[in-house]
Amino acid sequence: MARTKQTARKSTGGKAPRKQLATKAARKSAPSTGGVKKPHRYRPGTVALREIRRYQKSTELLIRKLPFQRLAREIAQDFKTDLRFQSAAIGALQEASEAYLVGLFEDTNLCAIHAKRVTIMPKDIQLARRIRGERA
């Protein structure tokens, strides 16, 4: 911003802001006596970054075991009925599925960043899968 020359102005006399400050102070003190304290909220993105760091450090499975098991059995029903699974087989399926999804989301994030965005969209997932050669 360019510097501008300041000109003298005629004063109006009394100082009005003092009254305003007094009313501000009265407003501040009034809610503290009878009002309910507002819950603390983090700024947008702070919790997301904390979760990213937390999950990048961890090695545990992110999808709950029983819902994944039900889904795997439901999908297997379409191919052959009355299939039985060892618990190790379900565990291996879940490990592989989560590894695939995490990798896909990493590539999806790179696609979003390439488009100068921070929000991933379905078109980013489609592009990532197309580049990988999974979907023509």
From Swiss-Prot:
<feature type="modified residue" description="ADP-ribosylserine; alternate">
    <location>
        <position position="11"/>
    </location>
</feature>
<dbReference type="GO" id="GO:0005634">
    <property type="term" value="C:nucleus"/>
</dbReference>
<feature type="modified residue" description="N6-acetyllysine; alternate">
    <location>
        <position position="37"/>
    </location>
</feature>
<feature type="modified residue" description="N6-acetyllysine; alternate">
    <location>
        <position position="19"/>
    </location>
</feature>
<feature type="modified residue" description="Phosphoserine">
    <location>
        <position position="87"/>
    </location>
</feature>
<feature type="modified residue" description="N6-glutaryllysine; alternate">
    <location>
        <position position="123"/>
    </location>
</feature>
<dbReference type="GO" id="GO:0000786">
    <property type="term" value="C:nucleosome"/>
</dbReference>
<feature type="modified residue" description="5-glutamyl serotonin; alternate">
    <location>
        <position position="6"/>
    </location>
</feature>
<dbReference type="GO" id="GO:0046982">
    <property type="term" value="F:protein heterodimerization activity"/>
</dbReference>
<comment type="subunit">
    <text>The nucleosome is a histone octamer containing two molecules each of H2A, H2B, H3 and H4 assembled in one H3-H4 heterotetramer and two H2A-H2B heterodimers. The octamer wraps approximately 147 bp of DNA. Interacts with HIRA, a chaperone required for its incorporation into nucleosomes. Interacts with ZMYND11; when trimethylated at 'Lys-36' (H3.3K36me3). Found in a co-chaperone complex with DNJC9, MCM2 and histone H3.3-H4 dimers. Within the complex, interacts with DNJC9 (via C-terminus); the interaction is direct. Interacts with ASF1A, MCM2, NASP and SPT2.</text>
</comment>
<feature type="modified residue" description="N6-methyllysine; alternate">
    <location>
        <position position="80"/>
    </location>
</feature>
<feature type="modified residue" description="N6-(2-hydroxyisobutyryl)lysine; alternate">
    <location>
        <position position="10"/>
    </location>
</feature>
<dbReference type="InterPro" id="IPR000164">
    <property type="entry name" value="Histone_H3/CENP-A"/>
</dbReference>
<keyword id="KW-0007">Acetylation</keyword>
<feature type="modified residue" description="N6,N6-dimethyllysine; alternate">
    <location>
        <position position="28"/>
    </location>
</feature>
<feature type="modified residue" description="Citrulline; alternate">
    <location>
        <position position="9"/>
    </location>
</feature>
<feature type="modified residue" description="N6,N6-dimethyllysine; alternate">
    <location>
        <position position="80"/>
    </location>
</feature>
<feature type="modified residue" description="N6-acetyllysine; alternate">
    <location>
        <position position="123"/>
    </location>
</feature>
<feature type="modified residue" description="Phosphoserine; alternate; by AURKB, AURKC and RPS6KA5">
    <location>
        <position position="29"/>
    </location>
</feature>
<feature type="modified residue" description="N6,N6-dimethyllysine; alternate">
    <location>
        <position position="37"/>
    </location>
</feature>
<feature type="modified residue" description="N6-(2-hydroxyisobutyryl)lysine; alternate">
    <location>
        <position position="57"/>
    </location>
</feature>
<feature type="modified residue" description="N6-(2-hydroxyisobutyryl)lysine; alternate">
    <location>
        <position position="28"/>
    </location>
</feature>
<feature type="modified residue" description="Phosphotyrosine">
    <location>
        <position position="42"/>
    </location>
</feature>
<feature type="modified residue" description="N6-acetyllysine; alternate">
    <location>
        <position position="5"/>
    </location>
</feature>
<feature type="modified residue" description="N6-acetyllysine; alternate">
    <location>
        <position position="15"/>
    </location>
</feature>
<dbReference type="Pfam" id="PF00125">
    <property type="entry name" value="Histone"/>
</dbReference>
<feature type="modified residue" description="ADP-ribosylserine; alternate">
    <location>
        <position position="29"/>
    </location>
</feature>
<feature type="modified residue" description="N6,N6,N6-trimethyllysine; alternate">
    <location>
        <position position="80"/>
    </location>
</feature>
<keyword id="KW-0832">Ubl conjugation</keyword>
<feature type="modified residue" description="N6-(beta-hydroxybutyryl)lysine; alternate">
    <location>
        <position position="57"/>
    </location>
</feature>
<feature type="lipid moiety-binding region" description="N6-decanoyllysine">
    <location>
        <position position="19"/>
    </location>
</feature>
<keyword id="KW-0013">ADP-ribosylation</keyword>
<keyword id="KW-0164">Citrullination</keyword>
<feature type="modified residue" description="N6-methyllysine; alternate">
    <location>
        <position position="123"/>
    </location>
</feature>
<keyword id="KW-0544">Nucleosome core</keyword>
<feature type="modified residue" description="N6-butyryllysine; alternate">
    <location>
        <position position="24"/>
    </location>
</feature>
<feature type="modified residue" description="N6-methyllysine; alternate">
    <location>
        <position position="65"/>
    </location>
</feature>
<feature type="modified residue" description="N6-succinyllysine; alternate">
    <location>
        <position position="57"/>
    </location>
</feature>
<feature type="modified residue" description="N6,N6-dimethyllysine; alternate">
    <location>
        <position position="10"/>
    </location>
</feature>
<feature type="modified residue" description="N6-(2-hydroxyisobutyryl)lysine; alternate">
    <location>
        <position position="5"/>
    </location>
</feature>
<feature type="modified residue" description="N6-methyllysine; alternate">
    <location>
        <position position="10"/>
    </location>
</feature>
<feature type="modified residue" description="N6-methyllysine; alternate">
    <location>
        <position position="24"/>
    </location>
</feature>
